Amino acid sequence: MKLTCVVIVAVLFLTAWTFVTAAPHSSNALENLYLKAHHEMNNPEDSELNKRCYDSGTSCNTGNQCCSGWCIFVCL
């Protein structure tokens, strides 16, 4: 019974702490996300969603991720 109460209090405390510490940053993060999405709507060719392969020097797992088709930990 005591352990259950301690766990419940700990979860409530951590939840409250998360909301208190994240509140000032979360609104700014959403604003930056909105501005980036708005920029991509105005310039669709600049959108990262259109990129289907990685440029040389970018880390990779398989060769089919790289534009060149060659991957040795980084795109060649």
Swiss-Prot record:
The keyword Secreted applies. GO terms for cellular component: extracellular region; host cell presynaptic membrane. InterPro entries: Conotoxin, Conotoxin_omega-typ_CS. Residues 1-22 form the signal peptide. It comes from the Eukaryota. Residues 23-52 form a propeptide. Expressed by the venom duct. Disulfide bonds join C53-C67, C60-C71, C66-C75. Keywords: Calcium channel impairing toxin, Cleavage on pair of basic residues, Disulfide bond, Ion channel impairing toxin, Knottin, Neurotoxin, Presynaptic neurotoxin, Secreted, Signal, Toxin, Voltage-gated calcium channel impairing toxin. It is found in: Secreted. GO terms for molecular function: calcium channel regulator activity; ion channel inhibitor activity; toxin activity. The presence of a 'disulfide through disulfide knot' structurally defines this protein as a knottin. Belongs to the conotoxin O1 superfamily. Omega-conotoxins act at presynaptic membranes, they bind and block voltage-gated calcium channels (Cav). This is Omega-conotoxin-like TxO2. It comes from Conus textile.
